């Protein structure tokens, strides 16, 4: 099973990805984790990424795409994987299609967690309040002003992916405002339908 989780920040992608990892035994591939692992491993592409990050610059699509390609070739991805936080742009989406096609595989489905913006801001404020109450540090991006900027960036760059995957017949939407268990159940229903359609 190879899938992409889409949705704005705070939609619950990380929570749902973790549940999918536990149930299906496939890895969650997040770009941040992959970049750190490539740098730590000292691979050729990891060295290029480190040089860019050390210079305080953003890692290019070419480097991110190479790191993703390197990662999906690892043995634990043979049964599938969950892409979380990648692709973020149409250029990256095209790169995913190419790298999978080169390997003779494809995406099973793309799941978008749909959540109302006002509810997202409320969710982030509550997450910050809960962290404070528990004596835990509050995430930098759990500040409403910072979060709203992240939302704007998401709609500008990443939201066009929904149309891209809809046109390919891969996009399925799930109500991200439902309870965590209800969202999980809906995702599992989507995955079952995708498996039966293969």
UniProtKB/Swiss-Prot annotation:
ATP binds at residues 10-15, 127, 178. It comes from the Bacteria. Its EC number is 2.7.4.3. Residues 126-142 are annotated as: LID. Monomer. Catalyzes the reversible transfer of the terminal phosphate group between ATP and AMP. Plays an important role in cellular energy homeostasis and in adenine nucleotide metabolism. PANTHER family: NUCLEOTIDE KINASE (PTHR23359). Consists of three domains, a large central CORE domain and two small peripheral domains, NMPbind and LID, which undergo movements during catalysis. The LID domain closes over the site of phosphoryl transfer upon ATP binding. Assembling and dissambling the active center during each catalytic cycle provides an effective means to prevent ATP hydrolysis. This is Adenylate kinase. It comes from Mesorhizobium japonicum (strain LMG 29417 / CECT 9101 / MAFF 303099). The gene is adk.
């Amino acid at each position: 099973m190879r899938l992409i989780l889409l949705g704005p920040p705070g939609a619950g992608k990380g929570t749902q990805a973790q549940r999918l990892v536990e149930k299906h035994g496939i890895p969650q591939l997040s770009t941040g984790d992959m970049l750190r692992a490539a740098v730590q491993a000292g691979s050729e592409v990891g060295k290029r990424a480190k040089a860019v990050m050390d210079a305080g610059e953003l890692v290019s699509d070419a480097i991110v795409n190479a790191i993703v390609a390197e990662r999906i070739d690892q043995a634990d991805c043979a049964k599938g994987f969950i892409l979380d936080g990648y692709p973020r742009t149409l250029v990256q989406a095209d790169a995913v299609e190419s790298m999978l096609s080169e390997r003779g595989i494809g995406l099973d489905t793309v799941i978008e967690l749909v959540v109302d913006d006002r509810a997202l801001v409320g969710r982030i404020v509550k997450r910050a309040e809960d962290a404070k109450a528990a004596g835990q540090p509050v995430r930098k991006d759990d500040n409403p002003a910072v979060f709203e900027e992240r939302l704007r960036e998401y709609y500008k760059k990443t939201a066009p992916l929904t149309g891209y995957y809809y046109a390919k017949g891969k996009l399925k939407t799930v109500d991200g405002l439902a309870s965590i268990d209800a969202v999980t159940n809906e995702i599992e229903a989507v995955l079952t339908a995708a498996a039966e359609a293969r």
